[in-house]
C-alpha cells in the first residue's frame, strides 16, 4: 500500500521486489483463497485494500480494489476493475460503504497499519479479513538457519497480530493458515518441503525481503543450502517436511466483525 519502506530502511519497490518475478512467483493458492472466501462469508461488495497487480482479487464478488499510484496497479490486467488511487489511511468512501473488506499480504506495506485498519473498519459494515504473517513465528522456519537476515526483515516489518486485532476492534478471530506442500504462492514458507526451489533466484525474488539484503547474504545462503542438500544434512534435520501435506507457520487470517 502506501508505505514503500521497511524498518530496515530499504525501499519496498512499490511492494514488489521485482515486478516480473512477483507476478510469476506469487500466484494465489486456491486452498488459501478458499479460507479467505470463507472468512468473508456472505459479503458481496468487497473492498480490497492493497490490490496490487490484481492476482488476489475475489472474482465471484463485486470487488473494489484500492492501491496507491506508482505501485502494482500499473501492472493490473485491463480486464480487472480499475484501481482506486488511495491509501489505507485515507479511504475515499463513506462510512459502511462495503459488505466486507480484505487485505492480502499487504498490511505490512502501509505507513500506519493501525490507522489503515481503523479506516478500513470505518468503511466496512461486515467482516474485515487480513491475510498476513505473525512476526513472532517468522523466525521458526528452517530458512532462519541459512538466511537469518531475510527473516529478521520479515519479522520486523510485519506488525504484531495483537496490534491488528486492537485496531480492528469488535469480535476478532485469528486462524493459522496451513500452507500446502505444493503451494503456488511463492513466499518463503511455501517451499518448506521443497528447499531446492529457493536456490532459484526467481523464487527468492518473488519475496521482497530478499531485495533488502546484499549479494553476500544471498551467496552465503546459496552455498550453505546447496552444500547441506548435497551432503544430506538438510534432509537429516528437515527431510520429514518433504512429505508433510501442509505446514503451519507464520501465515494467519485475522477476521474482525463489528
What is the predicted function of each stretch?
Residues 1-44, 55, 70-75, 127-160, 185-189:
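Conserved class I S-adenosyl-L-methionine
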Residues 43, 98-99, 125:
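Local beta-strand N-terminus motif with an aromatic residue
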Residues 45-90:
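Class I SAM-dependent methyltransferase SAM/SAH-binding core
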Residues 89-100:
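A short acidic, Gly/Pro-enriched loop at the edge of an enzyme's catalytic core
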Residues 99-112:
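A short SAM/SAH-binding and catalytic strip from SAM-dependent methyltransferases
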Residues 114-128:
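A short glycine-rich, Lys/Arg-flanked "PGG" loop and its adjoining helix->strand segment in the class I
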Residues 175-258:
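Conserved Class I S-adenosyl-L-methionine
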Amino acid at each position: 500500500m502506501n508505505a514503500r519502506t521497511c524498518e530496515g530502511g530499504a525501499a519496498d519497490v512499490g511492494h514488489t521486489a521485482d515486478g516480473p518475478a512477483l507476478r510469476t512467483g506469487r500466484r494465489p493458492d486456491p486452498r488459501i483463497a478458499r479460507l479467505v472466501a470463507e472468512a468473508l462469508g456472505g459479503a458481496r461488495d468487497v473492498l480490497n485494500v492493497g490490490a496490487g497487480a490484481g492476482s488476489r482479487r475475489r472474482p465471484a464478488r463485486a470487488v473494489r480494489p484500492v492501491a496507491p499510484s506508482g505501485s502494482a496497479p500499473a501492472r493490473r490486467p485491463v480486464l480487472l476493475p480499475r484501481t482506486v488511487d488511495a491509501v489505507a489511511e485515507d479511504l475515499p468512501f463513506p462510512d459502511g460503504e462495503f459488505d466486507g473488506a480484505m487485505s492480502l499480504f499487504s498490511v505490512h506495506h502501509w505507513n500506519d497499519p493501525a490507522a489503515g485498519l481503523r479506516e478500513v473498519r470505518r468503511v466496512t459494515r461486515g467482516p474485515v479479513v487480513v491475510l498476513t504473517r505473525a512476526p513472532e513465528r517468522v523466525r521458526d522456519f528452517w530458512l532462519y538457519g541459512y538466511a537469518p537476515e531475510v527473516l529478521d526483515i520479515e519479522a520486523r516489518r510485519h506488525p504484531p497480530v495483537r496490534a491488528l486485532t486492537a485496531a480492528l476492534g469488535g469480535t476478532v478471530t485469528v486462524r493459522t493458515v496451513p500452507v500446502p506442500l505444493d503451494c503456488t504462492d511463492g513466499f518463503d514458507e511455501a517451499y518448506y518441503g521443497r528447499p531446492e526451489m529457493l536456490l532459484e533466484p526467481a523464487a527468492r525474488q518473488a519475496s521482497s525481503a530478499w531485495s533488502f539484503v546484499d549479494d553476500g547474504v544471498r551467496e552465503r545462503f546459496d552455498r550453505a543450502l546447496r552444500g547441506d542438500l548435497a551432503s544430506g544434512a538438510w534432509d537429516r534435520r528437515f527431510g520429514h517436511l518433504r512429505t508433510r501435506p501442509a505446514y503451519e507457520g507464520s501465515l494467519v487470517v485475522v477476521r474482525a466483525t463489528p
